[in-house]
Swiss-Prot record:
GO molecular function: aldehyde-lyase activity; transaldolase activity
Protein name: Probable transaldolase 2
Keyword terms of this UniProt record: Cytoplasm, Pentose shunt, Schiff base, Transferase
Residues of the active site: K83
Primary role: Transaldolase is important for the balance of metabolites in the pentose-phosphate pathway.
Enzyme Commission number(s) of this protein: 2.2.1.2
Subcellular location: Cytoplasm
NCBIfam families attached to this UniProt entry: fsa_talC_mipB
Amino acid sequence: MKFFLDTASVSEIKRISELGLVDGVTTNPTIIAKEGRPFEEVIKEICSIVDGPVSAEVIGLEADKMVEEARILAKWAPNVVVKIPMTEEGLKAVHTLTAEGIKTNVTLIFTVSQGLMAAKAGATYISPFLGRLDDIGTDGMILIKNLKKVLDNYGLKAEIISASIRHIGHLEEAAEAGAHIATIPGSLFPKLWSHPLTDKGIEGFLKDWEAFSQKEGN
């Protein structure tokens, strides 16, 4: 499974990249706005740090506007992936952009049929939102499992990005379900490698070694 970092914080991206865990980055208008810097400046800096795909989202709602924006975004760096909302106009834009060789990430997917439509239109990535489905009492993980099955059934090339990941369980279940990618907020990463029993074990090892060293010294 590939890990994308769901943030536009350059310091956060640098810190987690040093661990060798970042395969790509996803952003959206909300995330970009939090940085208080020009959109282009932020995306270009992220692309200079991360070799993998960096998703940058269009703002327009009509296909022509999305395509126009996407062409500009794609010129910012070779690893830019254009994020497109899951709408009829979005599908039209994806179809056009795919023909031009511009990679796309169709976002805000909540049903298998939406994911299938995006994949058929030529999306490079499709992003089902787990946490938001859970928020309305639906099991988002069922969507991941069923989407993976449908893509495999028909040999569709789109990769599933498990998005709106809220906790470790989301990540682990998405991995078990065969999602290609998980995009994870920076705040969740430390919880993925930490466990109180690990800390307790290290403490015990050090305590035993200290006792052994003192004994040897005597």
